[in-house]
Amino acid sequence: MTAAMNHTLPNPAQPLRIGTRGSPLALWQAHEVQRCLMAAFDLPEAAFAVVVIKVMGDQIQDRALKDIGGKGLFTREIEDALLDGGIDIAVHSMKDMPTLQPDGLILDCYLPREDVRDAFVSPGVARLADLPQGAVVGSSSLRRRAQLALRRPDLQLVEFRGNVQTRMRKLEEGVAQATFLAMAGLNRLGMAHMARGPIEVEEMLPAVAQGAIGIERRVSDVRVEALLAGIHHTATGQRLAAERAFLLKLDGSCETPIAGLAVIEGDQIWLRGEILRPDGTQSIPGALRGPIADAAALGTDLAAQLLAQAPNGFFI
């Protein structure tokens, strides 16, 4: 650590303000970033302040995301606070992040990625295949709903908004017989035992950037840039470069069922992607391999290949 860097480290008198949503999972993620920075720079807990910011997506629970504004509903107020100087960094679940950041902000720091798989959660059924004909399944994810409709068109799919705890309570109340959650979130909350088990990616390709935590900052803040460089996980960044370029080319939002996963194999990246009709009547999968250095171009190329196979009105 340089002497200049030492003078700019957070301290109890000038703590680093970490902006986050207020759900238990979001708070865990914010504190994980704090723990990583404490370990990397030998800092006390008092050198940080976690700032909870209410976002529209958490306040409106009775409507589908696509009907009230999509992914930006989970980030807009936090990014406004970052731009206004009310916080110094913002911690996000990357699968909730729009592909483009507002002018003045950059997202270039990621923690090591967690389990990317979806989890099958049901009080009374062990596997998806064991659900009876016509069973009610809750999900707010267009991707999961389309993938389920493709594999099990007999299922009744109902909207299932809310944080992990809210959705588990809905299951207990009998609103649905099963739901799907990200294994990463369950692992982080110490709730992995609530899942019947993970669903392998060959059966259900996950959301782009699922399991990844991203840290957003102001472009002009060189002090924070130096701090975050000390905890950035390069391999996760490389994987997300491919996945988010894939999503960007597809104009991905909460209105389009898109799945994608990049895996590093030696000096290569293997990117798998899938686009689906919202009603689950058609899926167009694909995959490409290429050098890690070309990760973003790989994502763009795979998206173009899938779009070329999609008929007009595919996402409608």
Identify the role of each PLM range.
Residues 2-54, 59-60, 67, 75, ...:
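Small-molecule-sensing regulatory modules
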Residues 17-19, 51, 90, 108, ...:
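Short, well-ordered beta-strand segments
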Residues 73, 81-83, 92, 97-102:
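Extracytoplasmic loops/domains of multi-pass membrane proteins
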Residues 85, 133, 174:
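Structured loop/turn residues at beta-strand edges in well-structured enzyme cores
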Residues 94-97, 103-155:
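A conserved helix-loop-strand patch within extracytoplasmic ligand-binding domains
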